[in-house]
């Protein structure tokens, strides 16, 4: 907008020490009733007036970030909550910024593929020691809902010398990361710890989290090792049996050699009903649709367990017709472009199962087999399958 460019020019003017021009343009914006309290406060600071006190800025813009840096003011704690990927990357790499804010930004930036996971790993190792005695790894009530708490938990897992404490810490860490939508970034930097932690029967309590993390980090072989432990311990161990059923759908999607099991599907379906009955059918339909899109045969009785009104596989949706056409004609670039659009936008409110089926099928048809499977896994994790 015109106001944005005026603000940008004014900031450049004050940086070039043309303060009178910047002050005049800022006053004109105020007189026109433009609403941007953070900008005006920061501009006043840069012009040498009152020092800004900004305690919250959840929708920070690149201009506001640059102004905060120029004014040598700290970023508010919530600055990384809704920022764009490029800005998240900048915040994560801003050495003068509070570590807690950088950690939050780094997690989100890695999740958006805008930052090397190794940078997140280095940030996780900063900031002192780990949990206090009241919040030790594996303790009840450890939530790790902030990036700083997850970093501390990661350090506890890394420094644990025994396998059970390390598994307990990683279990807490992966659960917290999944709740906060950052499982893939956390899993990627935790894979070295996972490889050192060899699967064993006495660690079966950790198997579901290990499988989910390994699948998220595109490590199906590691996931398969932990899944086998859960299956092996399932007879006579209700916790292991429940864990095996919980992550079996992810193994079906991530590892093509995983066998279909009517019993595991039925148990998983019952778990979904217990967990969130309102979304159970949506998740189950999406799982089955993704399987079929990956050319895995789904028994008819599996669909019959779902309510008759559940949207099923591949139903014709006008909005996805162009995607299918591009894939069938092997227009690979167009297929990827239309896939990106279909992933982000759903103006026709297409049922999730049909949309995912169309996207994965199109990717496979256009010759992107590996990418189709990765997309299916990411979609399943995102849906909470």
Task: Give the location of each predicted region.
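Alpha-helical solenoid repeat scaffolds
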Residues: 1-385
């Amino acid at each position: 907008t015109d106001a944005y460019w005026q603000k940008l020019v004014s900031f450049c003017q004050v940086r070039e020490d043309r303060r009178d021009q910047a002050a005049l343009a800022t006053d004109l914006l105020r007189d026109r009733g433009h609403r941007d309290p953070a900008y005006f406060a920061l501009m006043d600071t840069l012009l040498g007036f009152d020092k800004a006190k900004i305690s919250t800025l959840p929708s920070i813009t690149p201009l506001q970030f640059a102004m905060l840096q120029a004014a040598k003011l700290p970023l508010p704690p919530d600055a990384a909550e809704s920022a764009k990927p490029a800005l998240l990357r900048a915040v994560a790499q801003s050495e003068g910024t509070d570590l807690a804010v950088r950690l939050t930004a780094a997690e989100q930036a890695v999740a958006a593929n805008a930052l090397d996971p190794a940078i997140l790993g280095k940030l996780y190792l900063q900031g002192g020691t780990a949990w206090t005695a009241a919040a030790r790894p594996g303790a009840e009530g450890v939530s790790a809902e902030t990036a700083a708490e997850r970093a501390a938990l990661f350090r506890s897992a890394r420094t644990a010398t025994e396998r059970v404490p390390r598994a307990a810490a990683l279990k807490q860490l992966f659960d917290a990361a999944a709740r906060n939508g950052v499982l893939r970034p956390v899993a990627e930097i935790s894979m070295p710890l996972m490889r050192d932690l060899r699967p064993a029967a006495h660690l079966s309590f950790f198997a579901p989290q290990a499988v989910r993390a390994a699948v998220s980090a595109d490590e199906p072989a590691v996931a398969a090792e932990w899944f086998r432990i859960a299956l092996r311990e399932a007879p006579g161990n209700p916790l292991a049996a429940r864990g095996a059923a919980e992550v079996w759908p992810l193994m079906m999607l991530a590892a093509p050699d995983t066998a279909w099991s009517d019993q595991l599907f039925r148990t998983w379906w019952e778990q979904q009903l217990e967990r969130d009955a309102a979304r159970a059918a949506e998740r189950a339909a999406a799982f089955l649709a993704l399987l079929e899109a990956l050319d895995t045969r789904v028994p008819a009785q599996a669909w019959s367990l779902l309510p008759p009104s559940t949207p099923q596989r591949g139903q014709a949706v006008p909005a996805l017709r162009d995607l299918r056409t591009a894939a069938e004609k092997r227009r690979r670039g167009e297929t990827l472009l239309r896939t990106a659009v279909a992933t982000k936008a759903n103006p026709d409110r297409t049922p999730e199962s049909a949309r995912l089926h169309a996207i994965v099928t199109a990717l496979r048809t256009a010759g992107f087999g590996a990418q189709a499977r990765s997309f299916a896994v990411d979609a399943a994790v995102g849906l909470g399958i």
